[in-house]
Amino acid sequence: MNLALALMINTLLALLLMTITFWLPQLNTYMEKTNPYECGFDPLSPARIPFSMKFFLVAITFLLFDLEIALLLPLPWALQTTNPSLTIASSLTLITILILSLAYEWSQKGLDWVE
């Protein structure tokens, strides 16, 4: 009962805050707020420089592999259970998936900086 009440109150509070921010936007914009700022001078180059798509793909690949490696961190505690064979099998499956995905990424030249 307490959990349901807390979830209901949190949901209502979030909806109330979203409604308030939607109906009461900041309407007064000044030219100083919309101008770019670079040490008090006008910027010498555009602020929105394009970044390399190759860098973006390598960064996303790193995040995916990092997340998958983080799944292996509780492995020493999981091996202390009464049935460690299931834990070993699941961890070996995860490591196999990691190796296969790394081999696929390497074969598709997803880790190369230059073309």
From Swiss-Prot:
Single Gene Ontology BP annotation: mitochondrial electron transport, NADH to ubiquinone
Top-level taxon of origin: Eukaryota
Record text on subunit structure and interactions: Core subunit of respiratory chain NADH dehydrogenase (Complex I) which is composed of 45 different subunits. Interacts with TMEM186. Interacts with TMEM242.
Organism: Hylobates lar
Keyword Transmembrane assigned: yes
Name of the top EC class for this enzyme: translocase
Location of this chain's protein in the cell: Mitochondrion inner membrane
Membrane topology listed for this record: Multi-pass membrane protein
Recorded catalytic activity of this chain's protein: a ubiquinone + NADH + 5 H(+)(in) = a ubiquinol + NAD(+) + 4 H(+)(out)
Protein's name according to its UniProt entry: NADH-ubiquinone oxidoreductase chain 3
EC number of the protein: 7.1.1.2
UniProt keyword terms in alphabetical order: Electron transport, Membrane, Mitochondrion, Mitochondrion inner membrane, NAD, Respiratory chain, Translocase, Transmembrane, Transmembrane helix, Transport, Ubiquinone
GO molecular function: NADH dehydrogenase (ubiquinone) activity
Record's function text: Core subunit of the mitochondrial membrane respiratory chain NADH dehydrogenase (Complex I) which catalyzes electron transfer from NADH through the respiratory chain, using ubiquinone as an electron acceptor. Essential for the catalytic activity of complex I.
Family affiliation: Belongs to the complex I subunit 3 family.
GO cellular component assignments: mitochondrial inner membrane; NADH dehydrogenase complex
Pfam families, per the entry: Oxidored_q4
Annotated transmembrane regions: 3-23, 55-75, 86-106
